[in-house]
Amino acid sequence: YTLHTLFPYTTLFRSRLRNLYVDVRSVTDTAVAPGNRWFFVSMLLSALLVWVAGRRVLEHALVRLTVRWLPEGRLRRSALALAVGLASVLTISVAASLLRWGLTRDTVPSADMLTLLDQLQTLVVFCAFIVGLGRALLMRAHPSWRLPQIPDQIAVALGPFPVLLGLALMVIGTQERINSVIDSSLALTVAVNGLTALTVALVFFFALLRYHRTRRRYTLESMSGVAGLIPFVVGAWIGISLLALLGGYLTLAYFLTVKLLWMSVVAATAYLLIACRSEERRVGKECMESV
């Protein structure tokens, strides 16, 4: 693709982009107008408060309830992991809703603006879900609560990557949503998909690289069974994706990296739910037998 085909500044394209910019400018100008400014600022501060302090308060409350009502063991650790992940998703979702309310309370956004806001809010929830999953599985602050058999050194080394992946997806996903709203050219859509594929592949690549370096540095044993195959499969998948990018097959690379991302999210979610459910059944069976 040439620069002109990737960024086709035709009259129609410029008109759509300008209209969206006008819509965004209208919403923000209304939100910070003298009569609405304090409400917007209060919603912005409330969103930050919920995101930072609210998550800790909710997480602490859920942890206290879990410790109080569930017996020690894998069931408690499963519930604690779910509580940590749930607290992250709920608080970030509420913060995004408050920010949207502060922006749109005193204005009537256009259809394109409403579509963009809806898509961005969904994207925020998905990115928050990724961050919550990472925190729930790694449990850096509470190693004794960790469900997977992950050494502390590896958990600490991999800790920043769920947040990094969530932030990267938020930035690139925003561009994808804008392209969708303004109905941009196919060439630009494919180019953004290629950038998404490159970003996701690099995050997974550096996470895998840090995993191997940490394992060698601390002479840690490799995982056994099916879990031991995960680094190899992920590495091969990333390699194929990067080769597709280098070969110019952007759509194929995008397909592979999106599948890798979704399989990782689904597998991690299923692991948490199955661990919690199976342990709940085991504890229930033991209680029935004791009676």
Pin down the residues of each PLM region:
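Low-complexity, acidic polar-rich segments
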Residues: L6-T30, P231-V234
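Hydrophobic/aromatic interaction determinants used to assemble and anchor large protein complexes
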Residues: S26, T30-K285, V291
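Short, small-residue-biased leader/transition segments that mark boundaries at the very start
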Residues: Y1-L12, G284-C287
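Generic intrinsically disordered, low-complexity segments enriched for polar/acidic and small residues
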Residues: Y1-H4, R18, L208, R215
